[in-house]
């Protein structure tokens, strides 16, 4: 529903058309859905898809986010074709942060109701040719999991990227995204470096300082985010902390036990190392 601009650090509405409107005590949130987005099979994306997705998660405890969703959301209802109302179990002011993207992703990826509602069990459904709202569809993939090829939709202007447009995404009006994007598993460190140096790949992730320096000594076209140390932004926005599974019984469901763990930690030392 909400994406993240990682440069500004601000959320923006993607499938949603706004940042949601709460009632006075934040126990209800009304969300407008952006009109004009089409699934890759041509169907309109609307409130039915959003309501179905959240209720699917709530009703299937095999889905990882089910317990957390039921902890805060009481019900999700369709108001009209492009409006959804969320009723919370308690005051919940951080609604968009919890149910949108704030770091790397979200547990609440809207799925096509007209596809998933036809499945006997959504938790075992192998969606190998997914119908998507984004600009790329799966063109082909390796059954061993070594690579996957994505192709730009012919109607990408009706995808989330095209409909949201340059208001939030950084591209010019006359710019067309790459026709294909190929994600590959490149093997060990030596293989990864060789393929980067020989220009067989465009982007390489999770590179050590030593690997970067070795590759740059063989190919002067290889660059990082910055030309000088630290070469990339070192601030990791991921949360760091202990999470207790309270559903597993003693001793984790005992508040005194959890407080004892917290009080035993050297917070100053943790801050230095984390």
Annotate each predicted stretch with a short phrase.
Residues 14-17, 43, 94-107, 241-245, ...:
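A structural "hinge/loop" feature
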